Amino acid sequence: MKFAFTDEQRMLWDTSQAFLADTSSSRAVRMACASDRGFDDALWRRVCDDMYWQGILVPEENDGLGLGWVEMVIVLEAAGERLLTSPLFAVAQSAAALTQCPKTACRDALFGSILAGDIVALALSNPSSDWHCVDARVDTSEGVTHLSGEAGFVSCGYAAEHVLVAAHNADDTLSLWSINPSQEGVRIERTPTMDQTRPMAHLYMD
């Protein structure tokens, strides 16, 4: 099978390279990594306003670009080449997860938050090195839903306005929940990483 980029995809690569060459220099990366946030908020705003990369995987019906993983990977590869320090990877994960969810008002609102430049993080894996195991659980009693457990390796979770949590239901199926990281019973701690351009966090729920 022969694979080749379309003209539009090659243009996306070229514009991504040009933008990142101008904004993600070695000095800029080092300054972002050393900052309290771990990334440059002003640069993230430019990514959202000028490039609209946060909208690549968001469906057109939600005012996104409605593109696919080929286009997303083009941008992520360019970002990785330039060591772009930003919430882009976290937001791409979350947008991809939301596209697999039923169409609801909550889903639409979260897509809107992503397009507005909010950081929406995805808490998927348990705190161990086993990336295939979800630790969080959801229980419903007398109409009240309660999430408990932990999640590790949450990309940019410490800076997120919303966190999407994968959790086991009572019948052991999986569901996705949106939580406010500042609500009672939720604690998020930034965790040190070898790759300082990819800041991570640990999520606790009780």
Features from the language model and the residues they span:
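Short glycine/proline-enriched turns and hinge-like loops at secondary-structure junctions
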Residues: L67, W131-C133, C156-A160
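A short core secondary-structure module
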Residues: E150-R187
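Cytochrome P450 C-terminal beta-domain/meander region
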Residues: H132-S148
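Amphipathic, small/basic residue-rich leader segments at the start of a protein or domain
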Residues: M1-L88, A109
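A short, Trp-centered hydrophobic/proline-enriched beta-strand micro-motif
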Residues: A116-P127, V165
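N-terminal glycine-rich flavin-associated loop
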Residues: T85-A105
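Short beta-strand-to-turn element immediately C-terminal to the catalytic PLP-Schiff-base lysine
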Residues: T99-K103, S125, V165-H168, S178-P181, ...
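Flexible, small-/acidic-enriched active-site or ligand-binding loops
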Residues: C133-D135, F153-V154, N180-D206
